[in-house]
Amino acid sequence: MAELELVCVPTRILTDNDDIVDAIVEFGGHNIGPEDIVCVAESVVAIRQGRFTRPEELDVCWQARLINRFIHPDGSMASIYGMQSAMNLDGKWKVLGAFILGAIAKIFRKPGVFYAIARAASLTDDVTGTMPPFDKHIVFGPKDPDKVAEKIVSRTGCYGAVVADVNDLKRSAILGTSRGIDAKKIAQLLIDNPFGNDSQMTPIVIIKNYASVSGK
């Protein structure tokens, strides 16, 4: 009987000059079958889309400096530059309002309100949050992740595809899926972060035999 297996796909360094679907076919195509789910790290998708900047290119406002004082050092907004990037994308007053509402919500034991409102903050990888040479950059969330997932399915013939945001702190979120894929189920399968966005260079993971094991 087939069993689920997570296969990490090694690549070279992928940049904004690469097409992520081409890279998946080149490095993992030989191992992708019609019952498999192809998972790709959101930071690599965003880098390919040119959605990154360097900290020195940002003009940090007082709102970003203020809010950053209250952000946990392990969070995606650990630096003032990451916070400023989120403000540039969402608007500084929206992010400030989200912070105030989030602080009030925490009093009533309801966490996560800030990141639910300020979506750019939850999707931004701060400096050192991704693989070299982009570890000196701030990487924004990917654009149209559902469309990216659909392109992967169309090109590879796999059962499904997802764009995933996973870290070593047991945070697993699916930002985009192809049609018919249960994002919560895939997020749980990736909870231990099989991706290697640093020196491992394995930003692609194949969930083998997913369709048959899940009874699809």
Mark where each language-model region is.
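N-terminal and secondary-structure boundary signal
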Residues: 1-216
